[in-house]
Amino acid sequence: MTTKKQEKIKFSKAFWVANTVELFERAAYYGVFIVITLYLSRILGFNDIQAASIAGIFSACLYLLPTFAGALADKIGFRNSMLLAFTLLTCGYLGLAVYPTWLQSAGLVEYSTTTTFTGLLESNLQYGIIPIMALIVCGGAFIKSVISGTVAKETTPETRAKGFSIFYAMVNIGAFSGKTIVKPLREALGNEGLITLNYFSASMTFLALLAIWFFYKSAQHSGEGKTFGQIWNALIKVCSNGRLITLIIIITGFWMVQHQLYATMPKYVLRLAGEGASPSWYANVNPLVVVLTVNLVTQMMRKRTALTP
């Protein structure tokens, strides 16, 4: 009995490496995403509607593309996919830091605790941030499919629930950590901290890249999977399932509300409570509760299925 129990909680090296880099990636992503609309408005001069629209499209693409990125990842292998993903993410986050610096050196804007626009708003150069954000979307699309795929393939039916609870805990530890550094940077540097934050995110994804390069090896998922045509046909089949589409619409409603933590809440809190307020800490309630309760909930639901009332 004891031996059997020990086998159930034993995971492969690839499992732990994948979960560790997931923590790094989530810290990078949420550190930036909690202030993305502030960044777009205060650093690049977009108004509220423009900033929210760009952030919304960014998020929508990030959640749509994993379906297709996952198919490509199956073809080229998970290790190669993660190397590509973290390279794109590192370049993307670095671009979010470097691009405003270039705009400032061109005399179009001045950054300090506040921002003074000296020509940027009259140019179209603020839209140069779009292809940089596209790098993050493409890199993130691979990560969303590959890390969860690694967890699935590196676990057994007996250890899968525990494996995914560890994965989900890592996601939320990363989210909590990334958002925690936002307030100190804003207090110390003001608007300039919104730029500096991206160097932190780039360093996190670069560390993840190194971890994959040196430590990630697995024979579980090299070159296999479906073609894009098969994926597309499967999507059409899914869309014809009325019950599933109804469930997706219900879940979409939840995510529409949840994502207001990032789309509108930071600006709302700062305008209502002042610049000393901490929208990042308000948003941290979610990952903190998840980290503290995920193991308990996993144990409670162990003998139930997704359809068990």
Predicted regions and their residues:
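Intracellular juxtamembrane helix-capping segments at the cytosolic ends
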Residues: 142-156, 269
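Central cavity-lining transmembrane alpha-helices of secondary-active solute carriers
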Residues: 56-71, 284-297
